[in-house]
């Protein structure tokens, strides 16, 4: 393998929309996810929706639509 061509692999914080944070390894600085094992219905056994608020939601909010 060539030296100096691979990205740096480091420990980063993974942040969920429910507020849960945990460490993982990645080449990115920060990772954001919509669901994790703390809020996913399969693991919790109950129904819960986390609102991520995407581009369409921001547009509608900005221009007072819906």
Curated annotation (Swiss-Prot):
It holds the Pfam family Ribosomal_L31. One of its GO terms (biological process) is translation. Keywords: Metal-binding, Ribonucleoprotein, Ribosomal protein, RNA-binding, rRNA-binding, Zinc. Zn(2+) binds at residues 16, 18, 36, 39. One of its GO terms (molecular function) is metal ion binding. Binds 1 zinc ion per subunit. It comes from the Bacteria. The keyword Zinc applies. GO terms for cellular component: ribonucleoprotein complex; ribosome. NCBIfam families: L31 (TIGR00105), PRK00019.1 (NF000612), PRK00528.1 (NF001809). Belongs to the bacterial ribosomal protein bL31 family. Type A subfamily. HAMAP family: Ribosomal_bL31_1 (MF_00501). This is Large ribosomal subunit protein bL31.
């Amino acid at each position: 393998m060539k030296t100096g061509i691979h990205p740096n692999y480091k420990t980063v914080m993974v942040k969920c929309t429910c507020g849960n944070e945990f460490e993982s390894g990645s080449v990115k600085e920060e990772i954001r996810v919509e669901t994790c094992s703390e809020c996913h219905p399969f693991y919790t056994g109950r129904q819960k929706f986390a609102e991520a608020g995407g581009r369409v939601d921001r547009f509608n909010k900005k221009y007072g639509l819906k």
